[in-house]
Amino acid sequence: MRLFLSLPVLVVALLMILEGPGPAQGAPEAVDTSSGLDKLKEFGTTLEDKVREFFNRVKESDIPAKTRNWFSETLQKVKEKLRIES
């Protein structure tokens, strides 16, 4: 049974290999590759700048301090309620 199933799979794989690359799968030109790498490098640089700017903005804002204070206050309230009920 295994041989019966594996033979058609092998034949299809061989046909695909022997057919060769399709028109869309042709070898890329060197110019396209270098321009693609340049675009990728530019994208990486832009992304890096945006991420740095975001983290700097978060560091400079007072959101982390406010969040920390809110959690501390909420924790204190919960502790007080647990003491009263105990």
UniProtKB/Swiss-Prot annotation:
Key word Signal present: yes
Assigned GO CC terms: high-density lipoprotein particle; very-low-density lipoprotein particle
Keywords: Lipid transport, Secreted, Signal, Transport, VLDL
Disulfide bond annotation, renumbered to this chain: none
Compartments reported by the entry: Secreted
PANTHER family xref list: APOLIPOPROTEIN C-I (PTHR16565:SF2)
Name the UniProt record assigns to this protein: Apolipoprotein C-I
Source species: Aotus nancymaae
Upper lineage: Eukaryota, Metazoa, Chordata, Craniata, Vertebrata
Gene name as annotated: APOC1
